[in-house]
From Swiss-Prot:
Heterodimer composed of a catalytic subunit cdk-5 and a regulatory subunit cdka-1. Interaction with cdka-1 is required for cdk-5 activation. Expressed in all classes of neurons in the ventral cord. SUPFAM superfamilies: Cyclin-like. GO terms for cellular component: axon cytoplasm; cytoplasm; dendrite; growth cone; protein kinase 5 complex; synapse. Activator of the kinase cdk-5. In several motor neurons, promotes the polarized trafficking of synaptic vesicles and dense-core vesicles. In the ventral nerve cord, regulates the synaptic localization of the glutamate receptor, glr-1. In DA motor neurons, regulates axonal transport of synaptic vesicle precursors by inhibiting dynein-mediated retrograde transport. Regulates the polarized distribution of dense-core vesicles in DB motor neurons. May regulate these processes in association with cdk-5. May also play a role in GABAergic synaptic vesicle localization in the ventral nerve cord. GO terms for biological process: anterograde neuronal dense core vesicle transport; axon guidance; regulation of dense core granule transport; regulation of protein localization; regulation of synaptic vesicle transport; retrograde synaptic vesicle transport; synaptic transmission, GABAergic; synaptic vesicle transport. This is Cyclin-dependent kinase 5 activator 1.
Amino acid sequence: MGANLTSPLPHHHRTQTTSVCNHLFSPGDGGPTFAPQRDSNTSSRSSSNAKESVLMQGWNWSKRNIQPVMSRRSLPKSGSSSEATSSKSSDSLVSFTRNVSTSTSSQYGKISISLDRNQNYKSVPRPSDTTTIIPNYYSLREEFRRGLQINTRQDLVNNNLASNDLSVIGSPKHVPRPRSVLRDDNANCDISPIAEQENVPSEASTSELLRGLGIFISNNCDVSDFDPAHLVTWLRSVDRSLLLQGWQDIAFINPANLVFIFLLVRDVLPDERHLIHTLEELHAWILSCLYVSYSYMGNEISYPLKPFLIGNDRNTFWNRCVAMVTSHSRQMLLLNSSSTFFSEVFTDLKHCSSSE
């Protein structure tokens, strides 16, 4: 009954004989091995190297298959290079890295690289050149600017040249033309010397031009009960309504805009006087001219339709406005671009106010 349970398989010499199945927990003699194919030249090796473990085969395979990354042309020619980069030596990686670093340092040795405290490359200073491809007032060279003789008192930054000089230097984009500056109410305005030679009136006010416009309408319409004071009430009421409602910040009725309204009335009213028979129709027709004037000369993008509409006939209102724009678009644009044409229209309106 005193027999011991031992495994019939061979086990390690450290294993105690009294334990059960110690061979399952003791290190074995080695993993599965395989015998690689060998050439006739390698048959003389010792039998101890005939069997190698899988781990050893994998380690030796990784060392034997190291291939150099760079070609031999880029490496420096030396007699010990073949020995240093031997694939069977354990120091092949170290020697290969040294050779690559040596060749790289020889190629980029002439480049000067500066680092800051944080080991970052310092930025290359940019060239300090003040000239640009499209020269402006700040980047023109001194000698070129001196030759142009630019007038620094003008707003040259935004190219808002409003010089009264008739030379090309004063306004390089176009030849400036004389224009009259009209001020509101009883303020006098100065006309250019060319306009004075043509005996153009040198004074204009809003009240005078309103009276002249009313007299012209009274003389060229068939409405007997129309009075020039009606025109002043119609225009002032629309202007005041838009101001109170916040549609505009400044008043629209001024001498320059009255000249624009007179241009439409002078050219359109004689042809449509046979269509206007009552004071209400004349009122609607005048407000149509005023709406077109607001669209061309107003400071805002758009305006409401209600202050300009008399009654509910919107089709007639729009047809009248479109007809005015179609037939007199050229004259309306010419009034803003040509000071001569503006002076002519202004003179006609001024004569109407003085012909009473």
